[in-house]
Amino acid sequence: MAKEWGYASHNGPEHWHELYPIAKGDNQSPIELHTKDIRHDPSLQPWSVSYDPGSAKTILNNGKTCRVVFDDTFDRSMLRGGPLSGPYRLRQFHLHWGSSDDHGSEHTVDGVKYAAELHLVHWNPKYNTFGEALKQPDGIAVVGIFLKIGREKGEFQILLDALDKIKTKGKEAPFNHFDPSCLFPACRDYWTYHGSFTTPPCEECIVWLLLKEPMTVSSDQMAKLRSLFASAENEPPVPLVGNWRPPQPIKGRVVRASFK
């Protein structure tokens, strides 16, 4: 069997390029954001979403993350504006987190690591299929939201309560009537740059919108996320933690801010 990628020392991020050479490409994500080097671009528009809660379908544990999957067969749940030239369809969201509250995000801001990072993955329907969009530099738009520790977030608890049904790798459960915009912070300011998926194959097809303001969750809520397993039901238990890729070289890319 081919070596499967993961986050351990033998198959972790420093090995991904062995199977997926683009992981050493010029437009890889995540990156470190150095705010003093980021320019405000007054041409950047506000962004907005119109998500249909009925498009949420399932929640699953694939051994790498927990993912919520949406119906993207037509323009039901859409992201518009910002740096984007047209509307993008929501396909899924997932999270990256650490083994403790002091790290877990993939992007960092002036050296600050957050407890987790939420990625909402959208694709450009002008390319007809998600698979085709993966081959285009503007095929995918990801809204990234940092999670910091503070007071509990009730809307996040809805997601966490579903985790009991997907404790182990390979489990999937219905997850309906959820509008992920309930997780968004009040402030819509963002940074944007061109990058990649942060998991193999690490395709360089992403317009990133990283929100400046994190959402706040409690330490107990983070502990619940870390109660998932990367192992299947019949295997020795392996906790699902530390599923983050460290920042990659920026290689001359420009990060723009929607705010001064």
From Swiss-Prot:
Its EC number is 4.2.1.1. Residues 64-67 are annotated as: Involved in proton transfer. Its main location: cytoplasm. The modification Phosphoserine is found at S29, S43, S48, S50, S55, S219. Substrate binds at T198, T199. The modification Phosphothreonine is found at T73, T129, T216. Induction: Repressed by 3,3',4,4',5-pentachlorobiphenyl (PenCB) and 3-methylchlantherene (3MC). PROSITE patterns: ALPHA_CA_1 (PS00162), ALPHA_CA_2 (PS51144). Keywords: Acetylation, Cytoplasm, Disulfide bond, Glutathionylation, Lyase, Metal-binding, Phosphoprotein, Zinc. S-thiolated both by thiol-disulfide exchange with glutathione disulfide and by oxyradical-initiated S-thiolation with reduced glutathione. S-glutathionylated in hepatocytes under oxidative stress. Its cofactor is Zn(2+). Expressed in liver and muscle. Zn(2+) binds at H94, H96, H119. Pfam families: Carb_anhydrase. The keyword Disulfide bond applies. GO terms for molecular function: carbonate dehydratase activity; nickel cation binding; phosphatase activity; zinc ion binding. Reversible hydration of carbon dioxide. Expressed at much higher levels in the adipocytes of lean Zucker rats than in obese Zucker rats. Expression is higher is the adipocytes of male Zucker rats than in female Zucker rats. This is Carbonic anhydrase 3. It comes from Rattus norvegicus. The gene is Ca3.
